[in-house]
Amino acid sequence: PMSHPTNTVVVSAPPLPGFTTTLFVQADPDEYAVVAPLMDVSGVGVVYTQNSTSRPWHHAAGPAQATLRRSADRNVLLDAGQYAGKNRRMAQVGIDESWVRFQQRDLGLPWAMADSGYCARGDLPGVETILRSCGKTSGNVIAPLPVSKYLLIEDADKVRDLIEKQDRPVALIVEDGADPFGARGVAAGLVHLLAGGAPIGLLRADTSALGALAFGAPFAAIGTRPGLRHIPMKG
């Protein structure tokens, strides 16, 4: 879990416009029946996650629509999950704008999340591709950055510069075999990104999500199971 570095100012940010919470649960679409009552009681949001690169969009659409019907709050995000698995997409491929439009027009979500591919160690061009592609979309769009933990350890300055050159909120998703924030330098890298003031959330996390919120993230999500608390290593 992410610990607070010493001598830092802890600030919390308001939710993104259209949301009423900063804390989300990251869940499989099949977990709707478990997650929905939790949302009713606690007011948290949900990130429905497609964990197969072969599953069609509508797999998560049903639970998303059911959640929107159930609650006056619209704290729902869809994570396409294209960055994970044996056949995962890489960042340089770009994004599918029809997936963005599907979330906006068909589902009426307050925020659409692009279906970004994975950014490997040192893949700053991949980060740039995702941010540039998301910048060309219209409406409320979050740019997911699914990254190797080494991009936070080794290239936090450069990643922060790229994020601050564009105007989309960013959702950071970090790869590791277990807990990425257990590795030296990862938490410091995230805090460095958040210190820039750009809206950066953390998805697929454990209690590190609470640390991210304390340091100014406008949204963060805790996974319902270990595989949804980080990007599993490929294999």
Residue locations for each model-derived region?
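N-terminal active-site wall of soluble small-molecule enzyme domains
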Residues: G182-L190
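Extended alpha-helical scaffolds
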Residues: P180-F181, T207
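Glycine-rich phosphate-binding active-site loops on the catalytic face of alpha/beta enzymes
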Residues: G43-S54, W111-A112, L203-K234
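Glycine- and other small-residue-rich loops at beta-strand/loop junctions that grip anionic moieties
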Residues: E175, D179, G201-L202
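Glycine-enriched alpha-helix->loop->beta-strand junction motifs that scaffold or abut catalytic
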Residues: D40-V44, G108-L109, Q166-V170, G189, ...
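Short catalytic-loop micro-motif centered on adjacent basic/acidic residues
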Residues: L23-V25, P199-L202
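Active-site beta->alpha loop and helix N-cap motifs at the rims of alpha/beta catalytic domains
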Residues: M2-D176
